[in-house]
Amino acid sequence: MKFSPLVDELIQSLKCLPGVGPKSAQRMAFQLLERDRKAGQSLASALSSAMSDVGHCQACRTFTEETLCPICASHKRGNSEVICVVETPADVLAIEAGGHFSGRYFVLLGHLSPLDGVGPEELGLSLLEAHLASGEVSELILATNPTVEGDATAHFIADMAKGHQVSVSRIAHGVPVGGELEYVDSTTLALSFNGRLPL
């Protein structure tokens, strides 16, 4: 059954979200139209504002409405000479939620993927290299995802950093806290054994 053009357009637009198929998009559209038009209007307003006003931080490339994000603009960050390299702005939020890192970030907005046309320029690596060349960075922590592409990206950045007298490390990978060994994949187990620590 076909709906009105505006309802169809709303359903099609909602399908652009990750993990949202036709049925989920239809349920969301009907929820907003049938039960919560005020929330729908609020969503439309917030989405419109974000699409027009949110850009990328000129220093770290995370999302912000300003020239610099709050982290890069802060003079209270303890380890401003330490940069943690992540793939997405969501990774910044995850690390910040842990509260164990007080340095700055550099957001790649992806990972190296030559088959998809994503090379060093698309990841902003020339900006990262400019940070390293400034002499203000003492350590680079690579927190890319533990995937083939994430590993390749980390190795590329580590090689790039070699000429700048910067300490480079990679976050540890292994068995998650609260995880049970029988459910852990073999690659993660291998990383856990290779990265074991003395007690």
From Swiss-Prot:
Span of domain Toprim: 81-176
Q: In its keyword annotation, does this UniProt entry include Cell membrane?
A: no
User: Entry's Gene3D superfamilies?
Assistant: 3.40.1360.10, 6.10.250.240, RecR Domain 1
The alphabetical list of record keywords is: DNA damage, DNA recombination, DNA repair, Metal-binding, Zinc, Zinc-finger
In Gene Ontology terms, what is a biological process of this protein? DNA recombination
- Point out the coiled-coil segments of this chain: none
Zinc finger (C4-type) locations? 57-72
Which superkingdom?
Bacteria
Q: Which is an annotated GO molecular function term of this record?
A: zinc ion binding
Which is a Pfam family this sequence falls into? RecR_C
What family is reported? Answer: Belongs to the RecR family.
- Write out the function statement from the record: May play a role in DNA repair. It seems to be involved in an RecBC-independent recombinational process of DNA repair. It may act with RecF and RecO.
Which NCBIfam families does the record associate with it? recR
Report what the protein is called. Recombination protein RecR
Q: Which gene encodes it?
A: recR
